[in-house]
Amino acid sequence: MQVVQKRWLLANFTSGLMAGAYWGIDSAPVHYQLDGGPTYPGYTPALARDLIATIRTNYDVFSDAEAAVLENHGYLLAEAATRTHLAAERHEAPLQIPHPGWMSEPKIREALGDSSRQVFLGRGALHALLRPGPSIVPD
């Protein structure tokens, strides 16, 4: 989202002209905690900023780890933002993290270490064919 559009949206939320919540990929649920309010589960600000926000967005396929972490992050941010800013409008439903096996920061840091790196011809089927390793052609 462009800076001016984000500023306009947040100004409308603050003035009461609009109701809503905003969250960005480089944010973390801890940023939505109010003094004395509930704590929200989620990834750390450092993990969100340093790895999740840097996952390439060049129409390349995501690895299973990238897809799982991005989905978890979206769910967790939406939960925190809407509980903080839209509590009256929410329909209560228990939070179910889509991929609970992908909540460990060390595991994520290892799996997403090169996720910001763009690969010539991508990581899709053509990349798999050109990659050295076991043949994908059946005997």
Regions found by a protein language model. Give the residues of each.
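Catalytic domains of lipid- and phosphate-ester/thioester hydrolases
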Residues: 1-139
